[in-house]
Amino acid sequence: LRESVNPPVPAARAAIPVADIATRATELSNLLVTLTASAAAGANIGSIAKMLPDMSEKLDRQLAATTKTLDAEPSLDTLQSLQQDWQRRELATKGWLSQLTAQAIKLEEALTQLGDLQKTWGSTRAAAQETKAPDPILQQIDATLTAITVAQGKIQSERTALLELQSRVALEVTKCSTALTQIGQVQDKAVAGILAPDLPPIWQPKLWADALTA
């Protein structure tokens, strides 16, 4: 029998030496500014949020019109035209979704980084208190931990809004996929009808009866 291997226990975050706390706190302050700035929704994401309601309404109307057209058994040329239209719409909505996903990943990474920093500074606070560091040092550590918490809140808020927008865009991608699936099914049916032989199969009982009585 193979021996079970327990996962390694994560090492505790190393505390920052007291002599380095002031410098590291300044560096962290600059990092927090950078992280929160990069987490804010950019112009592209703002445009997506602004255009999405109109896009959603248009896709609803176009999907209803496409369904009606498909019910009328359109020609293969019409089906191909519909397919190309929906492929363009799908490409556009997937492009939006890709941008939102990239930003969501960036926010996840920022939150992970902040979580690690919070642990490091938490360990630093405990170590500084244990070694009876001067009050100004403890106050600086506390201010740094507060700044990390504030940054986490801002980025988490951006992430929540982004994920909500991402879900709404995903619904529009689904509409396009639904339309393309329906079009493909009707295309297959139309092609099968074209390829079906006009003559009745030779195994029809009536044909054999007619041949035997001829």
Residue spans for each PLM region:
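Flexible, low-complexity extramembrane segments of multi-pass membrane transporters/channels
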Residues: L1-A214
